[in-house]
Regions:
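Single conserved hydrophobic/aromatic residue that forms the stacking wall/gate
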Residues: 1-7, 11
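Structural motif
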Residues: 28-44
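Residue-level "hotspot" positions that anchor or transmit function at local structural transition points
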Residues: 2, 22-25, 104
Length: 197
């Protein structure tokens, strides 16, 4: 689906590209729609539901906008469960699976595209303008193949290395180590304000 007037395109699982060619992730969409709902007084419980993989910059932007957030395990099923249990209307993943619980129980690319067009039309702004106020932190994700995911995370040397990185990042970034739910992998994600740690 494309919007000729804005030269923007929304495709597949809510992947958007703004008029400048920048990829708009699920985190951007959560920011745009969460902010829009808050401005209209319709953000239930003042909360947007995310997963632990959402970008650190999203949380900083939410804090600046006075928008609350919840973090679930990775997977839209966990996002939806939290939304149902806590009466939230918007949630999703960085990957672009965005759930509007009033209309669907899972991500829907067409619905998300329509919702983004709704905001653009109501605010009379381009996608890039709607993203103002959100600075996405550089994020690096590495996978480590292991035979025992739990043992790898519990290893004293691994824990010491994770703590050292977390300490060096302080409040300006984070490190997240988690087991893959589908493969014999431990995933390590690091975010910081700059590419250099």
């Amino acid at each position: 689906l494309s919007i000729r007037r804005q030269r923007q395109m929304c495709i597949r699982d809510s992947l958007c590209v703004d008029e400048k060619g920048n990829v708009i992730t699920g985190d951007h969409i959560l920011y745009i729609y969460g902010r829009y709902m808050k401005e209209r007084g319709k953000l239930e419980n003042n909360t947007v539901v995310t997963t632990v993989m959402s970008n650190f910059g999203l949380y900083k932007a939410f804090d600046e906008q006075g928008i609350g957030y919840a973090k679930t395990a990775v997977g839209d099923k966990y996002v939806y469960e939290y939304m149902c249990e806590n009466g939230c209307r918007i949630g999703g993943e960085q990957s672009g699976h965005i759930i509007f619980s009033r209309y669907a129980s899972t991500g829907d690319g067409i619905l998300t595209s329509l919702k983004m067009m709704e905001v653009m039309m109501a605010k009379k702004k381009k996608m890039s303008e709607l993203c103002e106020g959100l600075s996405i932190y550089p994020q690096v994700l590495r996978n480590a193949r292991v035979t025992d995911k739990r043992a790898a995370q519990d290893d004293a040397d691994v824990q010491a290395a994770v703590k050292a990185v977390a300490d060096s990042l302080g409040d300006s970034g984070r490190i997240l180590v988690r087991e893959s739910g589908t493969e014999p992998l431990v995933r390590v994600m690091v975010e910081a304000e700059t590419d250099e740690i």
